């Protein structure tokens, strides 16, 4: 993405061209009271629920939360310590046990909002801080970013691992990036694989990890080392062209497309990532031609276009170019989900739509005509799981208003996919930009008003790490004060986890539930838990969540609890509500 160093792109932005769940039974003297029965049909995590807005909300009273659920009665569980409420017990306390019976409970909703930041590696914008760091320093920087992200209240990071047909991970296909090791193709120190460590650290901090690829750029203008022998420019030089100070993979060459898709396939197959992410670099941003008779230097693909026409092709050159990018986006979406259906595909295009569809008053750069990105078609065809248009302008900037453009993309995308706009948080404190943290907070508030926009992404992490104009502090104390889960993606999921069958806690309050034997379909396999708890019916609900294999649940006596299990795309099981007393 490299907006901080790309002067042509800055001009475009400025002008608008701008379970612990133990598998074995725990012994103890605790008691559970199960409140909900199997006859109540509740979808606690529908797509509609994921649109509940969080921005600016404080904890509400118990009477304001959830929907009323009553019990119709059912047979007791096999575990004698898990007692089922029935109408006969609803008005009294069971004298033969220490169970407190609940006759009516208002279920809390799962609060959801995508809160993420881009971590750019190109030109060492965010990470690594400089090339050639030791593996210990790389680990320390990764942990610092993840710790700060979790503290602020983020729930995902989007990390650039392929900026220029290179790799910030262990790859047998492409050379190691000079932004990581200093010299393209140099070996990683002591066999350290940064991507594996990124994923591990994100899991430990409760963050999703989305791998960010540039599909076409072969060399960035800031690069200092030459092409390594393993680089595409050396392996298949006919697939790469020079455009100004950049080298670019030619989108018109089918082998170039296959090369990039093979790289992404490799990462998806070998690493436990949550998402595949593309930014706005399809065809390159236009470069001013030296011949002033031309407004911009034309991309060097005339040979391929002539060949296409000679073979009977009828598209004009702009439509022909767009067809290549369309094919890439479609094939990427299909191939990722063929391998791992739960890995979400996201695209972050330039923020202004095609000229023919723009709202009144919106002006500026046309990615449809200049980058040959028909984003509106991708939305219509649903070739993505989330759209993150880069809305890098202020609310009050009429020709490129943040709010007007947010509403535009909401109309284009509808409710069938996620809309998570990109925020230009790095503009805070930049000379001449006059951005403050208040502008970003206002944009988050406006995003919260748009029911189809269920999150946002900060460009970039460095602004949050450095707490520019107290942006990280204000997020932590303000709109991110309450935790939030990533919105679910129900179109990807076949099934959802079953409601947990609880096993009575031991005296420490360590909760577990029965695990299915053998392998299960991924959609019904629980990977995370979410627990709401409160002291009594007059108290607001608090929400915690964790990985079923990493984060144990420790209960406190006498509190009320609602537990749900989630699969890889956030689809939730039915809830089980209970109290526990020693």
Over which residues does each language-model region extend?
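Substrate-binding cleft of secreted/luminal carbohydrate-active enzymes
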Residues: 386-395, 417-486
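N-terminal export signals
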Residues: 5-6, 11-33
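Active-site-adjacent "subsite" loops/lids of carbohydrate-active enzymes
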Residues: 120, 124-137, 216-266
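Catalytic domains of carbohydrate-active enzymes, especially glycoside hydrolases
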Residues: 140-165
